Every structure is written in structure tokens, then in C-alpha cells.
Amino acid sequence: MRALPKIHRRGPIECERKGLLVGKCWERSQGVPVARTLVEVARLAGVSRSTVSRVINDDPNVGAETRQRVWEAVRASGYQPHAVARSLVTKRTHIIGVVIPELVTALFTDPFFPILLRSATESCNEHRYQLMLSLFSSSADRQEMYERLVGNAYLDGVMVASAALDDPLIPDLLRDGVPFVCVGRHPDPRVRSVDVDNTGGARMAVDYLIRLGHRRIGALTGRLDTAHGQDRLDGYRQALTTHGIPFSEDLIVEGDFTEGSGMTGVQRLLPADPSAVFVASDTMAVGALRALRQGGVEVPRDIALVGFDDIPVASTIEPPLTTVRQPIGRLATLAVETLLDLIEHPGSGPRRMVLPTQLVIRESC
């Protein structure tokens, strides 16, 4: 197959100076025109206009060789398919939304979300989809977002991250038949979700502390109105039960996955005299370490800590944090792939996928 030579592009102003029609500007450099319409791409690829349209709109009946030839012409010429016109044909916008029911500050204080978004964006790019981010922290913001993006069919589908178990967004999406996937378990059996083994990971972490000789183990939980907050607490309880250690309410403090709640939470736990603490997120564990250091409590000499997530700071903080690693990047990729499958095959049944976790042993216990 003949390779398409490299081209040089000029901007609209330069085209106007040369008396060329802006919007249908053909230039030649090494014999290759810059295409601005389907007709021009068709001439460059040596096919009909309708064939170019079918390729751009992902018609499966176009042969592989022709499809490759057309996309080479599109890339070489710099042609940009018109998204609105394309959506009228395909009934799709090729945009999916990532909805995070959190304040904007969560993106800058909890590394989980940037890692998730980066991997989701990369996966969307691979499938020629765009990703739109929406954050809200109140019912009014949620309703405005829903009407503006989902209600007007602006999005082909939605990925919901870190939703509370009673978040009304989920029933709304189910009611309106919007393709969506949850990052994290949801109790409604109709909901597709991708998750990690939060219960098993927490159980593994607490079991490790018990095998080190700890019996009085505190738990600094995440938000207990979320599935992962509940599941990690369940794993903690299961480990205690397995080893015959009684569950004690005075060793449980609820946090909200923020560094600040880690600081205040561990301070509330100290009067109960734990020898070790399971912290349900690394971000909270960073706050706990800071509070303990300020109070003159040494880790792990005076108290042992284990976290959950294995975000980058876990390996660089002093002391390096023993933690449960969850594959955040893979979680995001699987969520996008699951959502796109649901968009392409609306009748496919809901299912839950769970990724394994791994205990990473460092120096905090």
C-alpha cells in the first residue's frame, strides 16, 4: 500500500492571504493536499465520499484495507470529522462522563481520583471517546448536572465513582435507561460495577497485624455510607473473629478518606490504647502519621499502622507505609471497557467484577 507523504499545514489567515477558501483549503507540500471535507479525503484515499463517511462512522461492513487507507488519509491531511454531524448519523456523541460526588478539592487532596482519571482518559482515547468530568457536592448541583448532561442526551454513558449507597443519582440513571457503571460495589443487582476486593484486602491487613502479635487493633474507617467504607470495616471484623479477638466499639472511629480525618481520627483512637491501627485509606494514614509525629508517638515503635490503596506517597513517607495495594489504573480501564460494552450492547446483563488486592509490607508495622 502506497504510504501517504508528510504534509505541511498553514493556518486560516495564511490561506486567506493566498486567496484560498477557508474551510475548504487545499494546500500542497510534497504532493499531498490538506483536506477539509469528506470529498477531499475521499480523493486523497482513492475512494468514494460515502465510503469515507462509513469508515468515520464505524460501519463494520467496510473492508480492513479500505478502512486503513481512509484513516491514513484522515491523519495525513488533518481532516477533523464534524462531531455534531457524526452524532446525528450514529445517534452517539462519543463522550462519556465521569461523575464524582465530591468537592473539587477532592481531586487535589486524594491521589486516588487523579490516578483513576488518568487511566480512564487513556482508555477513552484508545477507543476514540472523549471523557467529561463532573463533580458535585449537593443535591442542587447534582440535579443541574443531570439535566444539563444526562437529560439532554449529551453523554453516551456515565461512570460513577465513589457514590454513597443512597445517592439518588443511581436510581435516576436506572429510571432513565442511561448506560452507566459504578466504580465500587452497589447493592442494587441491576447495577453494573467494577470493584476491588475491599473486604479481603482489609482482612489480609489486619490478619498481618495479628500475626505480628497485636491484639488491640484500632480501625480508622472511611465513610460508612459508601460500599468500600463498609467493606473494609467488614474485613477488619472478619480478621478479628477468625483469631478469636472480640470486637470493641471504642476501637472504631469513622473518617471520610481525607488527610484531616486521619489526623483527628487517630487522636480520638489513642485514649483506647491500641497497639496498632488499620487505616482504611493511605490519605488518612498520612494524616494519622502526621498527628502521631506531632504528639511524640513513634511509628512503629509505639504504634503500628497499615493503610489501604498504595498511592505513590505510601512508599516515600517516613516511615514507608505498609498498605493494601489496589490496582487503581486497571480499575479505571475495566470501568471504561465495561461501560463501552454496555453502550454497544444495551441488552447485556449487569454484572459485578472484582479485582484482587495485595499486601505491600514496608516499615510502619
Predicted regions span which residues?
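Flexible loop/turn connectors
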Residues: 4, 8, 268-365
